[in-house]
């Protein structure tokens, strides 16, 4: 998916890929949503959860009411799931989505939601 996004010729192609990716993100049950942390400041409601694993890596889950955000979450989780705190400390969510040609086309509120997730990733290393 990453290479497809990088090679997309225009925003419309990227947008279709993002929406398609979001279909892979399962909708959590109400109980699962209740266990996730709400992300404030985004255009649509969004939830995020960090789950530490026994091997010192992390697994992430989340959901949004907006299809585009679900696609972005799915793309993000495929990039960061299974990483250690040290690996996550060097990951820059802003650079990641910028290199994919996505950040430039998102609203400030959507970027704010992603940046809050990025801050939570950095907080894992404190």
From Swiss-Prot:
Q: Read off the InterPro entries from this record.
A: Fe-S_metab-assoc_dom
- Its domain of life? Bacteria
User: Which Pfam families does this chain map to?
Assistant: SufE
Q: Which SUPFAM superfamilies match?
A: SufE/NifU
Record's PANTHER family? Answer: SUFE-LIKE PROTEIN 2, CHLOROPLASTIC, SULFUR ACCEPTOR PROTEIN CSDE
Give the family per the record: Belongs to the SufE family.
Return the protein name.
Uncharacterized SufE-like protein HI_1293
Q: What high-level taxonomic lineage is stated for the organism? A: Bacteria, Pseudomonadati, Pseudomonadota, Gammaproteobacteria, Pasteurellales
């Amino acid at each position: 998916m990453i290479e497809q996004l990088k090679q997309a010729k225009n925003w419309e192609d990227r947008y279709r890929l993002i929406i398609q990716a979001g279909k892979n993100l399962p909708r959590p049950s109400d109980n699962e949503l209740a266990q996730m942390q709400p992300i404030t400041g985004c255009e649509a409601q969004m939830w995020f959860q960090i789950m530490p694993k026994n091997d010192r890596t992390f697994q992430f889950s989340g959901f949004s009411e907006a299809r585009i955000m679900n696609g972005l979450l799915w793309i993000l989780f495929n990039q960061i799931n299974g990483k250690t705190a040290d690996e996550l400390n060097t990951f820059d969510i802003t650079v990641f989505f910028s290199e994919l040609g996505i950040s430039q086309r998102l609203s400030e509120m959507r970027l704010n939601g992603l940046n809050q997730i990025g801050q939570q990733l950095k907080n894992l290393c404190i």
